[in-house]
Each structure stands twice: as C-alpha cells, then as structure tokens.
Amino acid sequence: MPGNRRQVPILHRDADFLLRALQPDDFVRTSRYENANREHLAPWEPLRDPGYFSVDNARARTLLQVASMDEGEALLLLLLDPDDGEVLGRCSYTNIVRGVFQACHLGFSLAAAAQGRGLMARALRVANRYCFEQLGLHRIMASHLPRNARSERLLESLGFEKEGYARAYLKIAGVWEDHVLRALVDAPR
C-alpha cells in the first residue's frame, strides 16, 4: 500500500531539516516538541487536558498514528533538526479518501524557534509533491482561522486556492471557530 510508512523514504535532507515519516519510537521526541511549544500552539489547536502532554499519552497517540499510516489513512511527517534529531515541525495528511475522491486534509505546525525561516514552505512543497506523485492523490484540503495570517500566506504561496468559508467549523482553544477552506488540486494527468 503506497501510504505505508515503511515505504515512505526520507523525503528531504539538507543542512536545515530532515523530513521523514513518523515512526513508533518517535513518541519521546514528539512529546518534547508538544511540551516545548505548548503555549505557542495553544491558540491554533483544540484544548488539551494536562494528561495529553505526558510521555505515556504521546506513546499511545504515536502508535495510533502509525497504525493509521499502515492502513493508508494518513501520512504523518516530522521535520527534524539534522544535527540533534529534535522535532522542528509536523505535516499531517489525514482522512485520506480513495475511490473517486483521492483527497486528504492537511494540518501542520512549526516550533516557535523554527518560525520565519521558510522551513514549513519547503517541507510542504516536497510533501505535497509526494502526495500527488507517489500516493496518487488529486486534492489536498487545508483550513485556517481567518486571523491566522501566517498560515494564510503559507498556503497561498503553495498554490492553495480559497474555496469557501465555514462557520463554527472546528473547536479551537475551546471555541467553535470559523475557518477559511482551501485546496490544492493536482494538474490533470
């Protein structure tokens, strides 16, 4: 199955970052990332109870996420520091639907310390191309809060077109928030 993490190579490696699929033993490094960026990411994510940030919870989540990749339902990628292996960010292609749709949803986050260096734009260019060329997807959908100017600029720079506006779309930081809906569609083949 093309979505299987064992078949996903290292997608990118240079002096700035390594981009590869999540592995079962990544739970410690992802837990460190979540804890170090807890306040930075809180305005853009669902409310998290304190137990969410434990290593045990990270282990359980990682195993579920790896299983979803093994089933071809997701592609979950980590941006890693090439020197120390610490997580700089994440790209999540989830809810992969096959058949006549061939689409997924994209989510992403970047460490506070890694902001403003163009890392996520570079990583998503590589990962989006992989989704189209290797996974055979036709559409990648993403949404962002209207006030999240950084995500808006990033998605626009990658060619994601605005397709709509959804009222009370996702519960973010405890509040049902409106979202701008965007999509990147692969060129017809």
From Swiss-Prot:
PROSITE patterns: GNAT (PS51186)
GO molecular function term, any single one: protein-N-terminal-alanine acetyltransferase activity
Entries under SUPFAM superfamilies matching the protein: Acyl-CoA N-acyltransferases (Nat)
Catalysed reaction, written as an equation: N-terminal L-alanyl-[ribosomal protein uS5] + acetyl-CoA = N-terminal N(alpha)-acetyl-L-alanyl-[ribosomal protein uS5] + CoA + H(+)
One cellular-component annotation, GO: cytoplasm
Enzyme kind, highest EC tier: transferase
InterPro entries reported in the protein's UniProt record: Acyl_CoA_acyltransferase, GNAT_dom, N-acetyltransferase
Record's keyword terms, sorted: Acyltransferase, Cytoplasm, Transferase
Residue span, N-acetyltransferase domain: 31-182
The protein's Enzyme Commission number: 2.3.1.267
Top-level taxon of the source organism: Bacteria
Compartment(s): Cytoplasm
Family: Belongs to the acetyltransferase family. RimJ subfamily.
Record's function text: Acetylates the N-terminal alanine of ribosomal protein uS5.
Protein name: [Ribosomal protein uS5]-alanine N-acetyltransferase
Organism: Pseudomonas aeruginosa (strain ATCC 15692 / DSM 22644 / CIP 104116 / JCM 14847 / LMG 12228 / 1C / PRS 101 / PAO1)
